[in-house]
Design a protein with these regions (language model features):
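HIT superfamily nucleotide-processing domains
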Residues: 1-132
Length: 132
């Protein structure tokens, strides 16, 4: 089964990537709750996060932590929230969301509609935060 995330990994579908290793990828959510909303995924296609084997799961969490630190530098916020929903795309993924209040993690709220330029600028800010 080839998910939209697998197509992003292969380059078939473009994405605003902010971090990548041989096993993991982080990219901007195109329907974000807040500017800087990042999705972190294993490159191995596994539907449910808690079905990911332990070593890969631990690596994913460490990768998410690294991305979250850069995200917090790039997008001023009190904290970077973490959410696992997994109902829309059958590929394990973690949401990293800049937050200043609990309601920033409310997935029932309308999503932002950012332009391609706004997404590119946000991705660049996060990429540059890795260099600091």
């Amino acid at each position: 089964m080839s998910t939209i995330f697998s197509k992003i990994i292969s380059g078939e579908i473009p994405a605003h990537k902010v971090a990548e290793t041989s096993e993991f990828l982080a990219f901007l959510d195109i329907n974000p709750l807040k500017r800087g909303h990042v999705l972190v995924i294993p490159k191995k296609e596994i539907d449910y996060l808690f079905d990911v084997e332990d070593e890969l799961y631990a690596g994913l969490m460490i990768f998410a932590k690294i991305v979250a630190k850069a995200l917090k530098k790039a997008i001023p916020c009190k904290k970077v929230g973490v959410a696992v929903i997994g109902l829309e795309v059958p590929h394990a993924h973690i949401h990293l969301i800049p937050m200043d209040e609990v309601s920033d993690l409310d997935f029932s709220k309308p999503k932002l509609k950012l332009t391609e330029q706004e997404l590119s600028e946000t991705a660049l800010k996060i990429l540059n935060a890795f260099k600091d």
